[in-house]
Amino acid sequence: ILSLLIAVALNSIPKFQKVLQTIFFLPYVTNTIAIGMVFAVMFDTNSGLINTLIEMFGGDPVEWLGSAAGTASYWHCMFVVLVYIIWNALPFKILILLSGLQSIDKQYYQAAQIDGTSKFRTLTRITAPLLSPQIIYLMITSFIGAFKEYNSIVAIIGPTATPYGYQSPIMGTVVWYLYQNIKGGKDGFGMGYAAAGSLLLFIIIMIITAINSRISKKFVHY
């Protein structure tokens, strides 16, 4: 939804569209590990920018990722990771939706304007249905991307996926567990576990792809 709103806003201001498009796309071509480390610094308990802003408005500092003074909750860590993922994935989604918007025939909007249709109704009745191929594609690829997430955890939480104060990798993802088993799993069967997990992940992605094909035929409007 956020990427759609930004794409619509960019499409409505053609004068600065190229400049803004470049600015929004920069995070996508930046090294993900480097961005994650920047986020880890921003959400640092003692000297992070986010806690500094919270304290400026009279609030108490939050243990986002944990520190020597306290342990962060799972949901605080998850919030930081989600903010990073959204910020990092947003440029690609905006670019796809913006290209879709520019391919929509302007006659639809002209007819809606003559009929006195509101902007909200135009968005929900014209723009969204005609962008359904791009929207469905982004939804499915985002779902698949969630299974493959690895860089964000390593960059923000660390290679052990264990926040400060915890004894177990509560932030471990599917790919993280596969990688840990490849490095050396329990009982010397790490490579076997990783191979089985990779096969299972492949099957899940194939099922999602099949569902995508089914949904596209039923709900996508060209």
Language-model-detected regions and their locations in the chain:
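A structural signal for multi-pass alpha-helical bundles of membrane permease subunits
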Residues: 1-222
